[in-house]
């Protein structure tokens, strides 16, 4: 069906038909969940038609394809997004209204897919939207996690992790493609030899076969028939149930091999602080890349009869180091299964793989024990050894006789496989994700590699799906924008810049404030319902929602909140601009400090929110189970965006862009994409504080940072930390957190991320925020300038830069 065929009447008939055929229900008897699934099936049918058309065009014209591998894709809910992109959201809304349903209620029936955790997965999802919209022939690849990350519950102030059984209603968007099932070999032993004809023979013994079963999720683009596909692999065991064991009552033993195989696609990011967890993570990574490459290579060979032209037709883009095994796996397929020489296989591989780095944190640059890689994928370890040997010989030409340097840069060293080094050696492109981050990679993290391979390094600043995060999440704001500049920005986000011409339009500025208040009210209602907290609608909604990690410095925010509490306790009648501090984040289950920080936030919230001296001047809210659908409500309501990581640690960030696009003002350090946001809006429209990267790095390197001196000399900080040590009236001891700041712990220095050092600068910036907020028209002007300058952070632009500078494929995007 074409867009014009999706009339209200046609949609009503199609939905009713799905209800009858799939559920045996008439409209009047159907549940909301059944109506949601019927709507999803109708929309999916349209997407599937377009996906087949797209695949046929790729087959016909032989265009170069982009294969985007990532361990997570945080796609969010699909029904509204797909209906919007297809241009049928108004008709679908009216059809449901005629059938007795509110569209918002039907949207709520859709579970958030448990396919991602944080910024990495959300970025990947935004890029799939961008690829589809601007005409890139792209496919994403990941794992179909049964339980995703986890469902977060807050009990007694503490995070509790529960399974997220999202597939119960989420698989309606997944189209099984059983014909493309692949077998992945895990473990066992390998015997290699050359036969009489000089052909390399590789024999596998005693391995565990795991079937990779693909499910395809169509990803729509805006106002286009081009569809990107997200292929998700599910692990299944091909081994038949041992009925003899089962019949004899040994049920668990009979199911053991099934369970071992299917555990691979059970959860995202299993804890890796023990060998079993490390083993499962590495199995997941190899499962993803092996299934994906087998699939791509088989289809390519069926079409062309050879893999010799593979690099001309495919780009394998690895999003962070998790899929780096794509390099030795492609070598394995080319040599072992297609009789290529090492040199020919390496030439193809190193022209096919592009690598995006997402971190400067040493612990996040993955390393695996050689023994574990050898145990789980012996042939891959053989190939890695050979890559390493040849790589080290190449390094020797640049650093002759410098054994220490070569050991530092080697792929395999100290019985460890360094995945980032493997990615650098085997990729034709290495990019960072903000201008600052890319410079840090070149100047510090990978400086020696940059000296050798400078032409490989480039930057592509992250971007967000602006239609989802502005047009869909904030329709009132989109309507206001379109009343002034039209709809062109939907496909050409740079047109948002025209809004800067309306800075003197007092009516527009007033309306901007009204829209923000409407969105605040929506969030306030949610907080009242789910947290039981009545927030002050006249307060500043100050928001920090992101993964919980020490470098992101939720702690700095906490310290400031406690200091404000002390001010109000000392002088309850003071002239104080009310604040509502809103947090949302998940802590990795094994990250004790992060989990204790969540408990600390909730202890402080309990103290402040129940203190009659404070009233509605100050509130603290922790929103449970933060996810995409909640972000779509929080971002439009936020007035202050907390982007306060220590300078030099955040690669880019994308939450900062979403807040900016929805008119929130950023308080932040000169870190990640904050630097480019500051350049875009001007220092007068952002609240910058703290050390910049050179100063922070120099202080850390000097070893002269002494937070105890700050504690002793700054009465505000001393009082805050003493309060933390003495507790917040709920019996929970936070001395361990205070000690981390003052004395260090777990082998790390005191206040590793320098929250105490930046505290006074942060507090001054927050005073500026309060002062500016008193002047509504000026605040709304600053908000408008942020919206007007946010177009450069659209994922359409990011994807177009990848396409032009790295993938070398055509798009319909106009810079």
Question: Which functions belong to the PLM regions below?
Answer:
Residues 1-815:
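A conserved ligand/cofactor-binding region detector
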